[in-house]
Regions:
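Internal alpha-helical transmembrane segments of multi-pass membrane proteins, especially GPCRs
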Residues: 34, 38-41, 74-77, 111-118
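Interfacial loop at the N-terminal end of multi-pass membrane proteins
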Residues: 1-46, 96-109
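Hydrophobic residues within membrane-embedded alpha-helical segments of Major Facilitator Superfamily
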Residues: 1, 50, 72, 79-82, ...
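Mid-bilayer segments of alpha-helical transmembrane spans in multi-pass integral membrane proteins
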Residues: 81-89
Length: 138
């Protein structure tokens, strides 16, 4: 779910920030951040819980494979942790700047650094698809 959303944000949403007039931009950004949070936060929390639960419970993925020892599963979890780190260390601070003022450099950085999440979520989706395929036919 987040992979499709992040591609929309990367290709359509963030680039359009540059077209929002300076007048009214901060009000727009505050509203944007608030509304986006209500949509994205629950999905990200469920995704994180769904990734961590199999680790905590040491669930088997397939014969001889557990979530805690499977390199592909652990790599997918690693992608998710990097996504969270990028979100809170890069994108959230940039949104905070934009809530205070229209800043062309911050908009460019937001769009550029969001590629980190876009690529990681895409890689994670590919890993989970491979894992599902491997485990389904094991």
């Amino acid at each position: 779910m987040m992979t499709g959303l992040i591609w929309f944000v990367q290709v359509v949403h963030y680039p359009l920030f540059a077209r929002i007039p300076e007048e009214g931009f901060t009000a727009y950004e505050r509203s944007h951040a608030n509304r986006t949070g209500w949509v994205v936060a629950p999905i990200m929390l469920v995704e994180l819980a769904a990734a961590m639960l199999p680790l905590a419970l040491k669930l088997p993925l397939a014969p001889g494979r557990t979530a805690g020892t499977d390199p592909l599963y652990l790599s997918a979890v690693g992608c998710l942790l990097l996504i969270w780190a990028s979100t809170f260390l890069l994108q959230v601070p940039l949104h905070r700047i934009l809530e205070r003022r229209h800043d062309k450099q911050a908009i460019l950085l937001l769009t550029a650094t969001n590629w980190i999440r876009t690529l990681l979520w895409s890689l994670r989706l590919a890993m989970l698809a491979m894992l599902f395929t491997e485990c389904a036919f094991a």
